[in-house]
């Protein structure tokens, strides 16, 4: 009897915690128990920022339930174009730094890949042309002009040529790394 009562209280407490987190989690970035706002954000080097966050939970106390609210801090990627984030990571201003043809060492490409792997990005370059959220998997070892893939009907084509022919878009930096997304 007592064990069942404790389980029911625990389940009720979990439900209340989910309920108080629902609205902030729909409006702000969050992790398991905290949500974060841009208020008071602090830029750091390397393409990241510190954001103020709030941890909240409902706790049982003697004869009542209390809301616990604590301050937390989260590390966020700098918002904006992906190319800017990559340049900030290296502290470089010239986009051509990200070109394997122009000497980007493979170890630096792998460092950048570890930094952005798993990052969710919004792109409108898909077949539909609508904005889609994608997850970065890895970086190509060649630039868009050297990275090739096979199309069913047309054979092998470079990423840069694909965009030029099929999307009618000439890439501004065809020698930069490609991002492989899932």
Model region roles, listed by residue range:
Residues 1-182:
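Argonaute/PIWI-family RNA-guided endonuclease scaffold
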